[in-house]
Regions:
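Bacterial N-terminal signal peptides that target proteins for export
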Residues: 1-11
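C-terminal motif of bacterial Sec signal peptides marking the signal peptidase cleavage site
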Residues: 18-21
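Bacterial signal peptide processing site
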Residues: 23-26
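Conserved functional acidic sites
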Residues: 36-37, 42-308
């Protein structure tokens, strides 16, 4: 939900320019899921969904650092995070009646960061609006012994016209922040859960398993047995992002429901395994962002152990 709010904040400030795409030699990743012609699309009517509000006192997840023996081996069926994989989702948001091109590049690095005694996988995320980089982010995930993928925090830098604007970081264990669950090992329809708690920056996202067994097609492929998770936050409980997850891939589509002013829609257009050189480039970007974090987030990020 935070990316959605970021677009609403920064889009009016951004100067548009034309971007020429660079050629890539990354290897496309194929999965064992056969293409299908969808018999029924997911039901995403623009009406509020009945998502239980997460009580900040009673509904936070029970995080146990001792339950993470092999935490960086994230092989969750719906949210695998293999180092060197990259997902690119492309689409649009709406702002003042205008359709704004939007693209997110999600790259799993081979870096590790220890948070609350747990070794986490570092993901490097780039968020583009009209071709401009409006956010770069370090995100931290770990898988517990039961196969659940946890979210232990993030360091996002927000930009407008190429200049730093803000860095609303939250990391579990600091300033009241607590880890949440990104993806259950066995999602059950109707189950809701906190995705993290960062009160210092009003990060209160939660998810609810909205639908199971769906079929959907995106530019890259068609997928069956897709699950749909409705995500919202305590501050925006009438606005939902609908995130579609395919087996062996992860997030393949994003839609919206309710009072979402930006009406963000995204579809998977690239799913690749980076070359060693490409992964090294992303690693350098992550280290550079960490150096910036030490400057801009002295009370949060600077209090953590460095990337490994």
């Amino acid at each position: 939900m935070r990316n959605l709010r970021l677009s609403a904040l920064l889009i009016p400030l951004i100067l548009a320019f034309t971007v020429t795409a660079c050629a890539t030699v990354s290897v496309p990743i194929t999965t064992t899921i056969s293409p299908i012609v969808p018999a029924a699309s997911p039901t995403v009517d623009n009406v509020p969904t009945d998502v239980a509000i997460i009580d900040p006192v009673n509904r936070l997840e029970d995080f146990n650092p001792d339950n993470f023996d092999d935490s960086t081996n994230i092989d969750n069926l719906w949210y695998p995070l293999k180092p060197g994989t990259r997902r690119v989702l492309s689409g649009a948001t709406e702002q003042s009646g205008l359709t704004i091109p939007h693209r997110i590049v999600f790259t799993v690095t081979d870096l590790i960061k220890v948070i609350e005694g747990v070794r986490t996988v570092v993901v490097y995320v780039e968020d583009y609006s009209e071709g401009d980089l409006v956010e770069a982010e370090l995100a931290f995930f770990a898988q517990d012994n039961d196969g659940n993928v946890w979210y232990l925090g993030e360091y996002p830098e927000e930009y407008a016209n190429g200049r730093f604007v803000d860095a609303p970081a939250w990391i579990a264990g600091l300033k009241g922040a607590q880890a949440g669950i990104k993806m259950k090992s066995e999602p059950q329809e109707g189950t809701s859960y906190s995705q993290g708690w960062g009160p210092a920056v009003n990060w209160t996202d939660y998810g609810r398993v909205d639908q199971l067994g769906q079929e959907t097609c995106v530019p890259l492929n068609c997928y069956q047995n897709v699950i749909v998770v409705a995500e919202s936050s305590l501050a925006e409980s009438d606005a939902f992002q609908l995130k579609y997850y395919a087996q062996g891939v992860g997030e393949v589509q994003v839609g919206w429901r309710g009072a979402d002013a930006t009406k963000e829609t995204l579809e998977l257009v690239e799913f690749t395994q980076l070359t060693d050189d490409e992964l090294a480039e992303v690693r350098t970007k992550a280290f550079n962002l960490e150096q910036s974090a030490l400057k801009h987030s002295k009370e949060v990020y600077a209090m953590t152990s460095p990337l490994e």
